[in-house]
């Protein structure tokens, strides 16, 4: 850790903030009433009777290490076709039938809101202010290299080319969370992908679609994977 502190000022978790680590490989659900009692945000359009339990143990541990050692973090990632459990896209979180778009819209809102709120509340607990540790979020990862080998976002929203509604919605939700905590001027939202230098125009088309008709630029950067 001393080497990291001497040579670097931020780190990115490889797997600990990916959806399958927070949601779990198998569903653990609770009733909406139980979730509200625990402080979970439930969207107005959420019509299901249960929600997934979210596990932040490893995320909290990383935030604590960062705060203790004066390091920043890049949060990776909220929406990805890979390393998101298939059950998250299933009807009632429990079978092999796909859920529908309206239900998935509400689940996306539930997940992004609760993950970002938890991180920023933890930052406030550790340092006194939100946005003090996580300076960037990879909101959507590798949409342009999406694969359909398992149940995922494209099962629900189909192939939308350069105009995927759930990708734009993810950035709208994430930016809304930054504004709710008044950190939109110090935390940046990224679209993250690899081989971006091979498909520059396609990447720009996607980012322009995300920002189109928005009052503010909700996607402010492109992450170029260099590992």
List the predicted regions and their residue ranges.
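Distinct, well-ordered alpha-helical segments
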Residues: 1, 149-150, 198-215
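Glycan-processing catalytic domains of CAZymes
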Residues: 3-5
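Intrinsic structural disorder
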Residues: 1, 162, 222-223
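Beta-propeller domains
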Residues: 189-207, 221-226
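Short helix-capping and hinge/turn segments at secondary-structure transitions, especially at repeat
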Residues: 215-216, 227
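Glycine-enriched alpha-helix->loop->beta-strand junction motifs that scaffold or abut catalytic
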Residues: 7-11, 216-219
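Substrate-binding cleft and catalytic face of glycoside hydrolase catalytic domains
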Residues: 10-190, 194-196
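Solvent-exposed, well-ordered amphipathic alpha-helical segments
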Residues: 175, 219-222
């Amino acid at each position: 850790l001393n080497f990291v502190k001497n040579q670097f000022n931020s780190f990115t978790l490889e797997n600990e903030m990916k959806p399958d680590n927070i949601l779990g490989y198998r569903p653990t659900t609770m009733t909406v009433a139980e979730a509200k009692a625990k402080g979970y945000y439930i969207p107005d359009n959420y019509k299901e009777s249960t929600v997934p339990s979210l596990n932040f143990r490893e995320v909290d541990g990383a935030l604590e290490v960062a705060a203790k050692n004066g390091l920043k973090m890049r949060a990776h990632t909220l929406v990805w076709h890979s390393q998101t459990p298939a059950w998250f896209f299933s009807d009632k979180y429990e079978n092999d039938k796909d859920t529908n778009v309206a239900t998935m819209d509400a689940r996306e809102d539930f997940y992004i809101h609760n993950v970002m709120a938890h991180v920023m509340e933890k930052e406030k607990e550790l340092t006194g202010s939100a946005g003090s540790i996580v300076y960037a979020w990879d909101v959507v990862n590798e949409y342009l290299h999406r694969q359909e080998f398992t149940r995922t976002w494209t099962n629900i929203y189909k192939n939308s080319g350069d105009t995927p509604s759930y990708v734009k919605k993810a950035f709208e939700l994430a930016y809304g969370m930054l504004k709710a905590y008044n950190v939109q001027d110090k935390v940046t939202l990224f679209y993250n992908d690899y081989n971006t230098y091979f498909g520059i125009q396609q990447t720009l088309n996607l980012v322009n679609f995300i920002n189109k008709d928005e009052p503010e630029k909700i996607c402010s950067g492109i992450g170029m994977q260099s590992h």
